[in-house]
Amino acid sequence: MPFEQTQLFCDEKQTILKKIDTRNEIPDTIKSIPIPKISEAGFHYEPKNVNICLPKINIPNEILMKHEVEKYRKLFQSKPQTARKSVSVRTVSCAKGCAQRCESERAEDEAGKMCAKILNFTCSKCQDRTQYSPNDLQKHFEMWHHGELPSFPCEMCSFSASDFQIFKQHRKTHRNTFVKCDICNSERSYTLLDLTKHFTSKHCVNGNFQCEECRFFTQDVGTFVQHIHRHKEVHYKCGKCHHLCFTKGELQKHLRVHSGTLPFTCHYCSYGAIHKDQLVRHVITLHKEHLYAKEKLERDQYDKRVAKTTTGLKLILKRYKIGPTKTFWKRKTIASGNDESIGKNAQAFNIVSKTQTKSEDQSQEQLNEEKGGRQHCEDGDKPIESGSEKATVLSTGQCNKADEGASAPSSVLSAVQGPTVLLVRNNKITIPANYSAKFMGFKMVDGRQHIVIKLLPANKQILPSPALQPNTEKESTANLPPQAMDNTGFATGLTAMNDTDFVKAAPLSCSSPELPRKVISEKETAFISEKNNMLQMVDDSKSVTSLPTPSESVTSVRLTTKVEARDNVDLWENPSTQSHPDLIGTSINSPDKVNLTIRPNAYSCGDMHNYCINYVNSELPAESSNCFEFSNQGSLPFHNYSKVNNKRRRFSRGAVCENLQRESSNKTVTQQSTSDSDTTSPLRKESSNSDSLLASISPLSGTLKIKTEIEEPCDLEETQNFNEQSLFTNENQNLLNMTEEPKWDDIPCAGSPMMPRITSVFSLQSEQASEFLPPEVNQLLQDTLKPRSDIKEDSNNIPSKNLPLDCDQTLKKSKEEVIKSSKDFQMQDIISVPSASVGVNVPANDLNLKCNGQEKQALSVLQDVRDPGVTTKIPSIITLLKTQSDAIITQQLVKDKLRTTTQHSGPVYVQNPLLTSEQKNPVFVQTPKGFIIPLHVANKPGLHVFSGRPVPLVNTQSVPAALLVNKKPGVVLTVNNGKPEGVPTVKTENVHSYGTVTKEPCRTPFLKAEHNRYCLTPGLCSSIGSCVNMKTCSENTLPLKGSYIIKTSVSSSVKAVPFANVLPEQQGPNVNVLDAVKQQNESLPKASLYTLMPDGKQAVFFKCMMPNNTKLLKPRLVQNSTYQRIQPKRPAGAPQKILLKIFNPVLSMSAVNNLSVGNSASSFQKEIVPSKPTVHGEQKVPQSSRDALPVSVQDLMPANEAVLSSTAACPGSSEEPVHISERSETRVSRSKANCTIERNFNKRKTCKNKFAKIKTRISQDSETAFVSRNRSCKRKYIDNYQEPPRKKSATHRKCKERANAEDVQETFGFSRPRLPKDSGRTLRLFPFNSEQLVKCPRRNQPVVVLNHPDADAPEVERVMKTITKFNGRVLKVSLSKATINALLKPVSITSETTYSDFSKRHKMLKPVNSVKERFVLKLTLKKTSKNNYQIVKTTSEDVLKSKFNCWFCGRVFDNQDVWAGHGQRHLVEATKDWNMLE
């Protein structure tokens, strides 16, 4: 007795059917029974009557409850991967092939002892080399070798045991035996126990073992290992693309992709397809009107032949009691028709239902046959040669002859040549004279054993088609529920089999309305159930689907199976498409009328039913007919519709409708028909010679196959499987007209613009960082680009003539407004953005809809414009875009429909760029308060920063500040009152853009340029601390009030990571972001510390980075009659480097006095120049753009200390020019006074590493005392200063390094006392990892401070050590009181008490007691036993995983649940003090 139901028609070793003439071997108990000779090619039958004796199989009669049925079902179907012993047909050639395979496997057994393998055993009695699991072998012996014990031999030695537990104990003695992992393919050997741990830790993701070569996954390590060995078997490899196929049929199907020809063409248009099912979908979707006309003609012909048929279709309704009050109806499957279907898992199992009572033996036992000529997934390598093979569907039952005769004229009959009754009695099957039988095996249905026998006709006979009565159309239409008629859109007889002859599929407009889930009303069902409470045949006079009036009854009316469309929320973008669907899914209306009673309440209880539908004789356009077969087992509840998994699919513009996936009905419906040997339909003759369309839904995988079969045998293998499972909603759910009412309920709303977008956290996107930005910003960031845009089409978008939009009209519209785009909103219009690399790309909006809890992503497909008229306009369009005025560009920014939040409500003036004589150089102009900087490149590759009150406000427009947002991808910095709110970096594919800044600066100079000279002049922005290398290019720039110029080397080498975004036409300066990983090892304060702000405001993630300079360049002073400038030596052709950075001014003060700890070989040269009325007295020249960061604010801009120290208290500062010469003498005197203290301090070495050698040169114009003091201090610098700390000791020494840096700074007297915690600061913002997608949080998003410079307490350092130890697994840290007190304790130490209190202060910072923290770790646990768990590590790095990026901190997650929870914690922190945020 087989104990587990296997995939009988998919298992390679069990059901491979060879085409050659062989004698079927039935093993064991039925070997002595004569077996008919079957030739599948000719089907010549030799014996007339064959009796097949089958062993009696007893199944308990008590299996009536659902849980018992499920228990037996699981018993028989627990492991489909393992071959089972069953009474099945085995060809000799198959046995030989298996023997050869086993020989090759035996040759590998020597090496197999050193590799992982699952415990499989063969039967020592049968000796047929069939592999069994230990439980299966035990069951096999109990069934076939009763009274004997199985043998479990050890593969590592000669030990053998009859009990598996003893065998397991023996295997423990081989624990030291080393084996290898087949997945890793490494030379490392494991013990058996270690190998199990290795599989669990390395190759298990969330408790699932997933195959890297296919989509198979399981939770059982043994099944997983066995599956891996399957990939090592003989494969069929494509010679062109090295694609591997497991069967020859799959290979032949794959080879058609490389043929380049379109063997299937549409009869109504020029459409061509590679596969037949694609052509079927095309015809159904676009040429319904032709099918309607053809249907009308065929219907008239059928009505004339109705009276000639004498046989009818019978239904056997079986009533089961599951529970006290629930009544289920099971429809026995009867199939008939032209069967040449091929494909994976596309089978119709015919089941013999064995009844328990003698009265039911004759009437209820039925044989459901496999259709003749069906090939299975393993046998797909050879086609069926016979194009007209017919499978016979036989029904048994005791029929009321009188009722049958009375109802014969009014019944729909399906005449089938062959036996009318197939009796199964006493385990003997009587085969008719004109049929041969093939035993296929057993099948478990509802806990009962069913015999599957395939009947093959002896000769090629044409089966007649059914005939219909003229009055059935009206009756069947009248019996339709009102819902069904309203939603289906057919005038008469929507689902009547006599009315429709072709496949009706969804037109895919808007959404998919659902077909009626039942054909009869509740009253009718109740009426039928009362009259059929006993298991009996339903008379034709009392039809299931007809009203309870015997005179008006029709035996088989119509079939409306609710087959929902795969894309049930997709929209047509083609306006010419039919706006309302006439029929959704795949509603097959065949001439054979079928009585269908579907009780959804029965399915809601999960009862397993077997329904099979075989549709015949539905003709499709141009002499082609359809044969639809629907079969399934194990129905699913109707209300599980929300669990439909929508998968991503790509569609090309030319053949979108080809790949539309249709979900099959998960219910199988029965059509029982009795054959009539006297009548023959001409339609059947036509269908045997013409092309036919076959759509079959597999019972095992629920896949839909639509095939067009022609006479070429090779074309029979082109069935395309869509592994989608159709789940059905509840019966009570109303059928909505989704045409007018699209499903936008599941689409997340945009959220309030005044708050951070919470909905973005839970977007199921992992494509790019731009997806985490709000749609308004994302559209703005991409509007001004000219990239290679991909056309994003909706998955059911059918190509239309209007798809390549008129680019001229679109561009004219784009000048005036920016079309708002949103993935999370509804579909907008299509805008076209020309690119220099491609002709014209029309980016449709990336529609992102949530379909029943699952978000569906429309994949972008590159679209080539085929319209020559549009292509010729491309150069002029590009020129137009490049030459359009900056006023129009500004209008696009202003007129955009954005509702962004800014903290200042006053008007902000947008200054347009100035046209300069030198077009290739960027312009930097002073930016006073109230001006925004539109860094736009228009017809010039330079970067333009325009602002300043002295500029004539001719093109300046005053707009609300809430409407302004930066429009370019790259670094977007929003500065409100001197505080950076967020700097997100958008990464797009193959697109480069320029980093831009949008700010409302303070009154201090932001960027200053000079007149009449071309020099590299990086200015210092006191409000945000950005150091930018820039180049003045105009002699007519704004008048300057005086500026300090820090000369930097253009040719200095800076290790930097360029922006991912750069405009294609940009050829000017390159924006570079320093490598975070590199600087993390070279930064002064590098630990990520966690601080708490007492004022309740949000903290910020900061990386205090110190740049590294590699080349020294001496300054060149140029005297001028008016003022003094510095010009660098610029090599010919050297590109300009522009470095946009945010830094901590307090940190920079200590860094400049420490002379850049992060620079291993840096040397600063101070040039003290005599003060002049218009010239600043002190010039400081770092050697590269990175050296401009640590410039002390007091050295350059002492008047702006208030702004730098606390921007919250002083949002604006003086507009007067900075004169450092006024403070130079004071600074010299302070250096004299503190030089002795510095010497004494240098004697106390706090770190072991040496600082870099620093050369300090003082100009001759400075005082000699200051020079001598500095020279004497230089030796102490060399001895005392460290090199950048190493990676291992970086965290340990951070506190000491900062203590040194701050004390040296305070010793010289350059620094002020530390500011209290509650004062706001402008700190440096830098990502953790330069490779992460989200560099910085989006604007208006809360940030968390980790390494605040004032929070270097050892308590926090201990926390960070723990975080580093767990390598990113820490989700939450609960700080103890000691740590919180250390963070909140204000430090205010003056320069007078620095030295005296240094040792005491340093000791105070050391922890007295151990700090206890609580860490919530992210660990994936796998349950090993009842209460034991073990940590499951991630899979190998080469396995492709889904990534989920946190839009707050940029952290990357591979688990969606963990990512969502992580975002929730950010949101809780963001909204904790919501009323306090301003």
UniProtKB/Swiss-Prot annotation:
Its main location: nucleus. Transmembrane segments: none annotated. Residues 355-394, 464-484, 656-694 are annotated as: Disordered. Residues 368-388 have a biased composition (Basic and acidic residues). Keywords: Chromatin regulator, DNA-binding, Isopeptide bond, Metal-binding, Nucleus, Phosphoprotein, Repeat, Transcription, Transcription regulation, Ubl conjugation, Zinc, Zinc-finger. Residues 670-681 have a biased composition (Low complexity). It comes from the Eukaryota. A zinc finger (C2H2-type) spans 152-174, 209-231, 236-258, 264-287, 1444-1466. The modification Phosphoserine is found at S652. There is a cross-link at residues 358, 390, 428, 518, 707, 792, 882, 895, 987, 1008, 1041, 1055, 1078, 1180, 1441 (Glycyl lysine isopeptide (Lys-Gly) (interchain with G-Cter in SUMO2)). One of its GO terms (biological process) is chromatin organization. It is found in: Nucleus. Through its association with the EHMT1-EHMT2/G9A and PRC2/EED-EZH2 histone methyltransferase complexes may function in gene silencing, regulating repressive post-translational methylation of histone tails at promoters of target genes. This is Zinc finger protein 518A. The lineage of its organism: Eukaryota, Metazoa, Chordata, Craniata, Vertebrata.
